[in-house]
A protein has these predicted regions:
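Acidic/histidine-rich, surface-exposed loop or edge segments in extracytoplasmic proteins
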Residues: 1-3
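Periplasmic OmpA-like peptidoglycan-binding domain that tethers envelope proteins to the cell wall
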Residues: 9-16, 27-29, 37-109
Length: 109
């Protein structure tokens, strides 16, 4: 998972090496589709969180496109505060929930 600062869709510098590793795998397995799912913690309104989750997924998608992955292989979706992986009542939990998950799936023929 790639995590984000509160209210931000900017990719933190420490995650570029992780994303670059994903790019290498995606280039090697060029018959895959990259599904990028963005999430937020539960702080703030649902509408704001939904938009922010879409922006986070979009930031990662743009990073991949800038590294040479064709847009036709990338799908991004924002889920807002749905599907938390940690407790939103703690700072640590909220930090874990502000994330993007990347799935590599076989392309449909």
């Amino acid at each position: 998972n790639i995590t984000f600062d509160t209210g931000s869709s900017a990719i933190q510098g420490g995650f570029t090496s992780v994303l670059d590793s994903v790019v290498m795998v995606a280039k090697e397995f060029d018959k895959t589709l990259m599904q990028i799912n963005g999430y937020t913690d539960s702080t703030g309104s649902f509408q704001t969180n939904q938009s922010l989750s879409e922006q986070r997924a979009g930031s990662v998608a743009r990073y991949f496109m800038n590294q040479g992955i064709p847009a036709s292989r990338i799908r991004s979706t924002g889920y807002g505060p749905r599907d938390p992986i940690a407790d939103n009542s703690t700072a640590s939990g909220r930090s874990q929930n502000r994330r993007v998950e990347i799935e590599m799936l076989p392309m449909q023929q």
